[in-house]
Amino acid sequence: MFKGGMGNMMRQAQQMQENMQKAQEEIANMEVEGQAGAGLVKILMTGRHDVKRVSIDDSLFGDDKEMLEDLIAAAVNDAVRNIEVTQKEKMAAATAGMSLPPGFKMPF
């Protein structure tokens, strides 16, 4: 079919595509936690950015509403950042060992 380098490159591209698809599925199904206020507010979020659980320490219910809202927003943002870090790590692992052309950068 393909000779030498081109055939090898096609096999590598197919392997990379399979690895990336597997990594994307793992990311979509993973759960990460975001926290704020030293763990007083916790958010459990999936890799699809769906919030599964919001946990608020009872001690915060007597505090002002604005502070609680800020802590919830910070915990959500922390969870999103945790997903992004994990996503980059998994995608980098999916392409590890692939001989990509010099200067080629993956879009993640």
Curated annotation (Swiss-Prot):
Q: Where is this region: Disordered?
A: 1-22
- The yes or no answer to whether the keyword Membrane is present is no
Q: What segments bear the compositional bias annotation Polar residues?
A: 11-22
Name any one GO molecular function.
Answer: DNA binding
List UniProt keywords, sorted A-Z: Cytoplasm, DNA-binding
Top-level taxon of origin: Bacteria
The principal location of this protein is cytoplasm
Q: Which family does it belong to?
A: Belongs to the YbaB/EbfC family.
PANTHER family recorded: NUCLEOID-ASSOCIATED PROTEIN YBAB (PTHR33449:SF1)
Its biological purpose: Binds to DNA and alters its conformation. May be involved in regulation of gene expression, nucleoid organization and DNA protection.
What HAMAP family does the entry give? DNA_YbaB_EbfC (MF_00274)
Q: What is this protein called?
A: Nucleoid-associated protein Mmwyl1_2533
